[in-house]
């Protein structure tokens, strides 16, 4: 994965070599946590594959092991993270791959293994951990977000939620957690007791944040 990252030296770079990566899908749209993309982590790091489609999880299940053929695709940089997709046709660094074309690049290897997350403290999270699948333990919601829900309600449409940043701390440092307004638990109350959060280190709105993956793995401690 590090070699692939090194190729993304420009805003968008065409991959001309035969490069394959094998890893686990550690984030997708199963719970609405990441739309129109999947994150593949090979144990050394991750990359976000942009996809044009809905219900991606039905084709590429969360935590499945996959092989991605990178030749012919483009790498791009979105802040501190590396993304991959089709050659860009507009202002984006890469375009999304159509669902109909996805399996020309992506092969399912195994659907029966769950990847191990890397256990980190908040202080260990930086750009070098971008798109890694991680677990952070003994986290506490900040005082001024107690009794809130994971996402704020959209004032223009009270039936929908907005993508929201929440904050957790470990007594020493504070972690930003980005929660997609489309996630299945957007309207649920935030945990009031210490907990563990599992997810990917992501880049959101110009900063590093944790994006929860597979919400049912949040553990009260």
Locate each region found by the language model.
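OB-fold nucleic-acid-binding modules
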Residues: 1-35, 39-65, 69-221
């Amino acid at each position: 994965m590090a070699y692939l990252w090194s190729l993304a030296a420009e805003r968008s770079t065409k991959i001309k070599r035969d490069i394959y990566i094998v890893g686990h899908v550690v984030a997708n749209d199963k719970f609405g946590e990441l739309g129109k993309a999947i994150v593949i982590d090979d144990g050394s790091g991750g990359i976000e594959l942009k996809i044009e489609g809905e219900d991606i999880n039905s084709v590429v299940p969360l935590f499945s092991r996959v092989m991605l053929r990178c030749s012919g695709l483009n790498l791009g940089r979105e802040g501190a993270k590396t993304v991959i997709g089709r050659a860009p046709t507009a202002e984006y660094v890469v375009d999304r791959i159509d669902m109909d074309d996805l399996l020309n690049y992506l092969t399912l290897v195994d659907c029966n293994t769950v990847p191990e997350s890397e256990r980190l403290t908040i202080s260990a999270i930086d750009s070098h951990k971008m798109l890694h699948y991680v677990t952070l333990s003994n986290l506490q919601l900040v005082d001024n977000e107690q009794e809130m829900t994971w996402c704020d309600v959209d004032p223009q449409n009270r039936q929908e939620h907005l993508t929201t940043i929440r904050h957790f701390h470990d007594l020493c440092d504070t972690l930003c957690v980005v929660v997609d307004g489309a996630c299945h638990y957007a309207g649920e109350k935030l945990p009031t007791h210490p907990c563990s959060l599992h997810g990917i280190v992501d880049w959101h709105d110009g900063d590093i944040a944790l994006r929860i993956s597979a919400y049912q793995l949040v553990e009260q401690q």
